[in-house]
């Protein structure tokens, strides 16, 4: 007698359909399309977890450069001076200081540049 898989097949397909929940149209209803959608979304998620790091670093650098140029220093010069003086503070913290505590940032820039 031939076994078609009944409950096993249903459970497997249901798993894919549940993962595709919240998508529009056939993407959440059709097994074949839902499976393709979930696989593609996983690829995007993997790729974008890497891109997120790049994008945030670029954002911090842009913020720093803007804040530094107001004080008459460029980003590249400032980072170079920090490294020469062996000051280890990451770009994220520097940009947060520049945004939220501008006076402290000014003092830090004066200290590093000697102006």
Swiss-Prot record:
Gene3D superfamilies attached to this UniProt entry: 6.10.160.10, Ribosomal protein L20
Alphabetized GO MF terms: rRNA binding; structural constituent of ribosome
GO biological process, one term: ribosomal large subunit assembly
A GO term from the CC aspect: ribosome
InterPro entries: Ribosomal_bL20, RIBOSOMAL_L20_CS, Ribosomal_protein_bL20_C
Pfam family, one: Ribosomal_L20
Keywords of the record: Ribonucleoprotein, Ribosomal protein, RNA-binding, rRNA-binding
Task of the protein: Binds directly to 23S ribosomal RNA and is necessary for the in vitro assembly process of the 50S ribosomal subunit. It is not involved in the protein synthesizing functions of that subunit.
PANTHER family: 39S RIBOSOMAL PROTEIN L20
Family the entry assigns: Belongs to the bacterial ribosomal protein bL20 family.
Name recorded for this polypeptide: Large ribosomal subunit protein bL20
Gene that encodes the chain: rplT
């Amino acid at each position: 007698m031939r076994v078609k898989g009944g409950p096993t097949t249903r459970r497997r397909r249901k798993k894919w359909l549940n993962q595709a929940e919240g998508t529009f149209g056939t993407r959440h209803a059709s097994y074949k399309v839902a499976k393709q959608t979930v696989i593609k979304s996983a690829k995007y998620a993997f790729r974008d977890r890497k891109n997120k790091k790049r994008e945030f670093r670029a954002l911090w650098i842009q913020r720093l450069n803007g804040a530094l140029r107001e004080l008459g220093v460029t980003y590249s010069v400032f980072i170079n001076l920090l490294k020469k003086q062996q000051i280890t503070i990451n770009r994220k913290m520097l940009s947060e200081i520049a945004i939220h505590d501008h006076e402290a940032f000014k003092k830090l820039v004066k200290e590093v540049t000697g102006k």
